[in-house]
């Protein structure tokens, strides 16, 4: 679906350079100034929610990281979400794509609020596709989180559990509406160089000839560390997320919100099965961290929505991102 969006954009602007519309600073970040061709998106996995969003992600090999184009004009004209199209997914693909849903919902739920987001250009055409957490996106993000926690383990465990498969496709779409409006932040920003700098990892259940870290895996592997870091910005939201995992938060102190949510996430990932327990399990070592940081810092489209991050690409932000990768080595 993302490839179709990119082709729609490039065929509508045949004289444009590859990087003209790609998110700055990796590209020029130019706005899309006219309607694109009609596009019907049909998901065959329960993960990206791309049928609902104005985002198209691709691997920019020269930068050793993923990036993309984000603009409302990229949103498909129509999305056809039929659970029958997901029935042939292997368990490993159910798991990896479902973890993308999990992080879409968690990141959009915890993103910087819409009224605190910067920059906020006065010209509407220059405004980013992602607006920050808001009352509308919250509805979709929280429901997608609850559904993923309930149905993803079932969909992975039993290929004949059609109810779970159907609910996961719905959750992916709901999360797409949520994060397509509010945005994602650190898990996704850090995942792009993780995927692009794969040291040789082959994921269980994927019959690939070349090393591959599935996108959902690259996103979820840092999640326990990420939400421990972001929790002080809004402990109440992080505790509400922990409650979705079944945690009794009635006596949890606000300052413990990150630890509680991080532990709930780690427990969920372990019980899901066949998930790498940190970057070390993917083959990364401490000597790789500097390059991972270099691949993360240009991801301004999402980092600008990260609560608690010293936004701006300076030394403090670099130290924070470095520490996050260090903390994500194992959980």
Residue ranges and their predicted role:
Residues 240-331:
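C-terminal charged capping/lid subdomain of soluble metabolic enzymes
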Residues 12, 16, 62-63, 74, ...:
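Generic secondary-structure signature for well-ordered alpha-helical cores
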Residues 1, 45-47, 284:
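Short glycine-rich anion-binding loops that position phosphate/pyrophosphate groups of nucleotides
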Residues 114-264:
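Active-site segments that bind and position negatively charged phosphate/pyrophosphate groups
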Residues 11-129, 233, 240:
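A glycine/threonine-rich phosphate-anchoring loop and its flanking beta-alpha core
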Residues 71-73, 94, 140-143, 233, ...:
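A generic short alpha-helical patch detector that favors 3-5-residue windows
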Residues 7, 28, 288-289:
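N-terminal loops that bind phosphate or other acidic moieties
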Residues 1-14, 52-53, 194:
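Short Gly/Thr/Asp-enriched flexible loops that form oxyanion-binding sites at enzyme active sites
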């Amino acid at each position: 679906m993302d490839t179709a969006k990119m082709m729609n954009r490039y065929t509508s602007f045949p004289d444009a350079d590859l990087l003209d519309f790609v998110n700055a600073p990796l590209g020029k970040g130019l706005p899309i100034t006219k309607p694109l061709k009609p596009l019907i998106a049909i998901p065959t996995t329960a993960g990206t929610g791309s049928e609902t969003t104005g985002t198209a992600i691709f691997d920019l090999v020269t930068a050793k990281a993923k990036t993309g184009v984000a603009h409302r004009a990229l949103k498909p004209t129509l999305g056809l979400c039929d659970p029958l199209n997901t029935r042939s997914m292997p368990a490993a693909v159910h798991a990896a794509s479902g973890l993308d849903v999990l992080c879409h919902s968690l990141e959009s739920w915890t993103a910087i609020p819409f009224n605190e987001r910067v920059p906020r250009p006065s010209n509407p055409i220059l405004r980013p596709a992602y607006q920050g957490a808001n009352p509308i996106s919250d509805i979709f993000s929280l429901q997608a989180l609850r559904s993923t926690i309930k149905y993803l383990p079932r969909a992975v465990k039993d290929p004949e559990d059609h109810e779970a498969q159907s609910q996961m496709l719905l959750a992916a779409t709901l999360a797409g509406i949520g994060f397509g409006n509010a945005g994602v932040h650190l898990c996704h920003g850090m995942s792009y160089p993780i995927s692009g700098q794969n040291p040789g990892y082959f994921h269980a259940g994927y019959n690939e000839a070349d090393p591959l870290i599935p996108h959902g895996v690259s996103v979820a592997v840092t999640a326990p560390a990420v939400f421990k870091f972001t929790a002080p910005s809004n402990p109440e939201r992080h505790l509400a997320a922990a409650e979705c995992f079944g945690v009794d938060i009635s006596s949890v102190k606000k300052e413990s919100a990150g630890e509680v949510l991080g532990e709930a996430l780690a427990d969920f990932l372990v019980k899901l099965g066949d998930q790498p327990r940190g970057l070390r399990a993917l083959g990364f070592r401490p000597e790789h961290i500097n390059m991972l940081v270099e691949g993360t810092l240009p991801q301004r489209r999402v980092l600008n929505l990260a609560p608690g991050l010293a936004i701006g690409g300076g030394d403090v932000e670099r130290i924070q991102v470095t520490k996050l990768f260090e903390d994500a080595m194992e959980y």
